[in-house]
Amino acid sequence: MIITVTTNPSIDRTIAVNSLTLGGVNRGDLNAIDPGGKGVNVSRALAAYGAKTHAVLICGDLGSQWFGKKLNALNIAHNIIKAEGITRSNITLQEANGTVTK
């Protein structure tokens, strides 16, 4: 069993856009909302390969239930320590030509 610790987890959103126009209005389709953060990403990779893992993470109170549901769906054992504040989020824009902007 490998235990991972994530002190700064994130809610990672990936949005597909045809092309990115700086200073303009960009519309896209939400492709995915995934749990992230270094330790969470390691636990996700380990679980995908069938290894036993246990994720320990500190989440803002509002994100803790969401993380719990997502990690349960991925069959990742976990302990979530609730903290004040909100959980960090990241947005990735993926253009049709393969360019990625974070």
Where are these regions (language model features)?
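Conserved N-terminal subdomain of the carbohydrate kinase-like
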Residues: 48-102
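Glycine-rich phosphate/adenosyl-contacting loop at the front of the ribokinase-like
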Residues: 1-56, 65
